[in-house]
Amino acid sequence: MESEEMLAGGLTEPRPATPEIQEIANKVKPQLEEKTNKTYEKFEAIIYRSQVVAGTNYYIKVHVGGNNYVHIRVFQSLPHQEDPLKLIGYQVDKTKDDELTGF
């Protein structure tokens, strides 16, 4: 399966969030709060999937307290472009058991 994970355009299997993924989520948290007009006291990345495009899309399931989760899609440009991380999309009102899919 390793070789399949490197195919451009394909989503990886869900993986446990790493400190790097938490850092990515933290960096786009203000963008999400602005778009949803909410403040998230808790913002813990749980799992993620990635997709290699002209950069990388990260799909991250974030626990925001209680039984509430959000799914966020973050785009990270190629390293030489030095663009900031960008929140591309989000899905609110998710649960722990909702599948993290491409959106």
From Swiss-Prot:
GO CC, any one term: cytosol
Transmembrane feature ranges: none
Cross-referenced InterPro entries: Cystatin_dom, Cystatin_sf, Prot_inh_cystat_CS, Prot_inh_stefin
Location in the cell: Cytoplasm
Name of the protein this chain belongs to: Leukocyte cysteine proteinase inhibitor 1
Positions of short motif Secondary area of contact: 51-55
Pfam annotation, one family: Cystatin
Keyword ATP-binding assigned: no
MF (Gene Ontology): cysteine-type endopeptidase inhibitor activity
Lineage: Eukaryota, Metazoa, Chordata, Craniata, Vertebrata
Primary location group: cytoplasm
Region of interest (Disordered), ranges: 1-20
Role played: Potent inhibitor of cathepsins L and S, and papain.
Membership in a protein family: Belongs to the cystatin family.
Residues with site note (Reactive site): 9
Disulfide cross-links: none
